[in-house]
């Protein structure tokens, strides 16, 4: 090490002017006018500057709020269909963050929160919409499952744990957390068992709705730092939830029947009832478009809770064409993700049109919507992903309808232009 260092013109041992280490203790010593700095101090300075830039950048990004058109355009890149829901969400999210930017509005007019309720079947894109918006806006995002929540005093997850999770996502930075988005899934599962108020305790239903009321409307939640209640002497973090956007979602199975009873859409009983054919019946998605707050009360949500979710958007069930689009068109489409995985092995992956259609039909049969697509594709590609790293000279893998149906193995195209069917192990 000493061979690479000079002791200077005078032959004296040189030291870093910042940390005091000698030239023999560091890799490099940079000389200036009567000053020396070592490589370790240079690296430390770079780290400090990079950290400061990281802290400043998000604040600069937050200064400009994307317009509803820009929000919608970003959603279009990742979410197929659901045009009305995307429009409703874009406007609601824009208004929410505009309210935060103008904390003291003119004329003393106080702007209310625009929390959102999403109604749609499993796998229709409720979670994806919320997650995509949070990522685009560069704000903390967390998810909670309403079925795990209980009111205070009961065994289960306290509603304030939701804020705890949000804080964890931003390293307990309260300022960042207060600009975050919380998505509460399965909100329909905490509906009252009947629309008549009960004198008995309903731990998983109305009680949880009551517990969520203040949190969603806006309160100062006291959250223990770093998630521990073991040290009572620690000061609790104070989080203002009036600045947090809450998006609640649920499938609301059977809600269409409540709407039909109110609006008499496609219903009729007795001899005077009009008998409609299958083609004339309104689809569930069409009926849900007519949902009113009174229908949600009848379903089991308390009026106060519905009042805290003023923005309502319904999502349609995904049909075959939409599922095919989801497989191939979005920026992070499943076929593109698996193609990238195969590319890491130096192999091209191709899904033929008939294969995409067969995958979509499988998902529809399972009634899992877009959520079930990944498990179907994983199952189809399992054997080939297992064998491929050990197989040489494969240039391309082709998936067609017969592969999806399990009637044949994927087609392998080798570099020597030799094509053969992969032999599946029995």
UniProtKB/Swiss-Prot annotation:
GO-annotated biological processes: cell division; proteolysis involved in protein catabolic process
UniProt-annotated binding residues for ATP: 121-128
Domain ClpX-type ZB: 4-57
InterPro entries: AAA+_ATPase, ATP-dep_Clp_protease_ClpX, ATPase_AAA_core, Clp_ATPase_C, Clp_protease_ATP-bd_su_ClpX, ClpX_bact, P-loop_NTPase, Znf_CppX_C4
One family name in Pfam for this protein: AAA_2
Residues annotated as binding Zn(2+): 16, 19, 38, 41
Keyword annotations: ATP-binding, Chaperone, Metal-binding, Nucleotide-binding, Zinc
SUPFAM superfamilies associated with the record: Glucocorticoid receptor-like (DNA-binding domain), P-loop containing nucleoside triphosphate hydrolases
Source organism, top-level taxon: Bacteria
Entry's Gene Ontology molecular function annotations: ATP binding; ATP hydrolysis activity; ATP-dependent protein folding chaperone; protein dimerization activity; unfolded protein binding; zinc ion binding
SMART domains xrefs: AAA (SM00382), ClpB_D2-small (SM01086), zf-C4_ClpX (SM00994)
One cellular-component annotation, GO: HslUV protease complex
Gene3D superfamilies xref list: 1.10.8.60, ClpX chaperone, C4-type zinc finger domain, P-loop containing nucleotide triphosphate hydrolases
CDD domains: RecA-like_ClpX
Function summary: ATP-dependent specificity component of the Clp protease. It directs the protease to specific substrates. Can perform chaperone functions in the absence of ClpP.
Family listed: Belongs to the ClpX chaperone family.
The protein's assembly and partners: Component of the ClpX-ClpP complex. Forms a hexameric ring that, in the presence of ATP, binds to fourteen ClpP subunits assembled into a disk-like structure with a central cavity, resembling the structure of eukaryotic proteasomes.
Descriptive protein name: ATP-dependent Clp protease ATP-binding subunit ClpX
Protein species of origin: Shewanella loihica (strain ATCC BAA-1088 / PV-4)
Lineage, uppermost ranks: Bacteria, Pseudomonadati, Pseudomonadota, Gammaproteobacteria, Alteromonadales
């Amino acid at each position: 090490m000493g061979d690479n260092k000079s002791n200077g013109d005078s032959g004296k041992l040189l030291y870093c002017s910042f940390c005091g280490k000698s030239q023999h203790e560091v890799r490099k010593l940079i000389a200036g006018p009567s000053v020396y700095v070592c490589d370790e101090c240079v690296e430390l300075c770079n780290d400090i500057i990079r950290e400061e830039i990281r802290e400043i950048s998000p604040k600069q990004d937050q200064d400009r709020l994307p317009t509803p058109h820009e929000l919608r355009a970003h959603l279009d890149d990742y979410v197929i269909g659901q045009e009305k829901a995307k429009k409703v969400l874009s406007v609601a999210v824009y208004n929410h963050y505009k309210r935060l930017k103008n904390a003291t509005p003119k004329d003393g007019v106080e702007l209310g929160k625009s929390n959102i309720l999403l109604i749609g079947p499993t796998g229709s894109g409720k979670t994806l919409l919320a997650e995509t918006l949070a990522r685009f806006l560069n704000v903390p995002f967390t998810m909670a499952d309403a079925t795990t929540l209980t009111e205070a005093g009961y065994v289960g997850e306290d509603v304030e744990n939701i804020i705890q999770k949000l804080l964890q996502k931003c390293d307990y930075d309260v300022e960042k957390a207060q600009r975050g988005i919380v998505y509460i899934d399965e909100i329909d599962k905490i509906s009252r068992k009947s629309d008549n108020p009960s004198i008995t305790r309903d731990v998983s239903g109305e009680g949880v709705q009551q517990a969520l009321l203040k949190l969603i409307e806006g309160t100062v939640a006291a959250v223990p730092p770093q998630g521990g209640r073991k040290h009572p002497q620690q000061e609790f973090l104070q989080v203002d939830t009036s600045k947090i956007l809450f998006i609640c979602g649920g499938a609301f199975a059977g809600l269409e029947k409540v709407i039909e009873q109110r609006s008499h859409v496609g219903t009729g009983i007795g001899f005077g009832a009009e008998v409609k054919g299958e083609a004339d019946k309104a689809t569930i998605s069409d009926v849900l478009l007519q949902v009113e707050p009174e229908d949600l009360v009848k379903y089991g949500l308390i009026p106060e809770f519905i009042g805290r979710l003023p923005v309502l958007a319904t999502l349609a069930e995904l049909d075959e064409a939409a599922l095919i689009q989801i497989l191939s068109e979005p920026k992070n489409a499943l076929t593109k993700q698996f193609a990238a995985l195969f590319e890491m092995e130096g192999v091209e992956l191709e899904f033929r049109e008939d294969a995409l259609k067969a995958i979509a039909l499988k998902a529809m049969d399972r009634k899992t919507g877009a959520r079930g697509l990944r498990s179907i594709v994983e199952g189809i590609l399992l054997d080939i992903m297992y064998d491929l790293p050990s197989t040489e000279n494969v240039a391309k893998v082709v998936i067609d309808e017969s592969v999806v149906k399990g009637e044949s193995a994927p087609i392998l195209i080798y570099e020597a232009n030799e094509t053969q069917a992969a032999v599946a192990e029995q």
